[in-house]
């Protein structure tokens, strides 16, 4: 199963927190000290906590669980999308729309509209419209694709959230808490760990650190899914005998 070592984390700068004046005292148990007015995260805590989170995500994936990757900061946006796509999971990487989980009924209607517009754009419907109407629908399609494209095939609520930056994505975390969906999150020294079921203390800004987290999670999810597929194949083989 995918695991991450202390050396990997040091190389990626996972241990660099935020400036000491921005700290959240609830993160004190995970802070090693400070250097040049920047908090240093204790990787002796982070390594086992991250590997425990990976083991749990692997389990969820092996039971056909759906994992929603959330990272709407510009620096993480593309990496979040790529990681989710690489393990056939789902993502929100632009703006978290309030009610995305707690008001799923309405979101489902918007997803239906997105899929209808996609069909229209491909079956020649747009070409039969006036230029103005076609432009309006194209813009609507782009807007919906931007906000819902990563969850349009999710088919219901996710079984877990993997979040880059607990502070930035606090609305998503709150919604997941309300619905009892487990939250796995990168929590930096300026963030509140409350509401996060699997806290991963670490740098949530450096792209190398973000890529390290996402790469490990995607790998463990792929592994979990392949276990699920292997057990399905075994079952059908037994039935055929």
UniProtKB/Swiss-Prot annotation:
One of its GO terms (cellular component) is cytosolic small ribosomal subunit. GO terms for molecular function: structural constituent of ribosome. GO terms for biological process: translation. It comes from the Bacteria. Pfam families: Ribosomal_S2 (PF00318). SUPFAM superfamilies: Ribosomal protein S2 (SSF52313). Keywords: Ribonucleoprotein, Ribosomal protein. PROSITE patterns: RIBOSOMAL_S2_1 (PS00962), RIBOSOMAL_S2_2 (PS00963). The keyword Cytoplasm does not apply. NCBIfam families: rpsB_bact. Belongs to the universal ribosomal protein uS2 family. This is Small ribosomal subunit protein uS2. It comes from Citrobacter koseri (strain ATCC BAA-895 / CDC 4225-83 / SGSC4696).
């Amino acid at each position: 199963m995918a695991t991450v070592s202390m050396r990997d984390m040091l190389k990626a700068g996972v241990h660099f927190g935020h400036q000491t004046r921005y700290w959240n005292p609830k993160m004190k148990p995970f802070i090693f000290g400070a250097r040049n007015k920047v908090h240093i995260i204790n990787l002796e805590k982070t390594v086992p906590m991250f590997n425990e989170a990976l083991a749990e995500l692997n389990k969820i994936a092996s039971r056909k669980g759906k994992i929603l990757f959330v990272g709407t900061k510009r620096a993480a946006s593309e990496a979040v999308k790529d990681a989710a796509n690489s393990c056939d999971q789902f993502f929100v990487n632009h703006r978290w729309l309030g009610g995305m989980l707690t008001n799923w009924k309405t979101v489902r209607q918007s997803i239906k509209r997105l899929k209808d517009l996609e069909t229209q754009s491909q079956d020649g419907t747009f070409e039969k419209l006036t230029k103005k109407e076609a432009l309006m629908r194209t813009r609507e399609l782009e807007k919906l694709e931007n906000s819902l494209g990563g969850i349009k095939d999710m088919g219901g609520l996710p079984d877990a959230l993997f979040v880059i930056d607990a502070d930035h994505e606090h609305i998503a975390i709150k919604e997941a808490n309300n619905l009892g969906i487990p939250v796995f999150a990168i929590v930096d020294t300026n963030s509140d760990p409350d509401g996060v079921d699997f806290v991963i203390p670490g740098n949530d800004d450096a792209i190398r650190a973000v890529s390290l987290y996402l790469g490990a999670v995607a790998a463990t999810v792929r592994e979990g899914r392949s276990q699920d597929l292997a057990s399905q194949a075994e079952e059908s083989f037994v039935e055929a005998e």
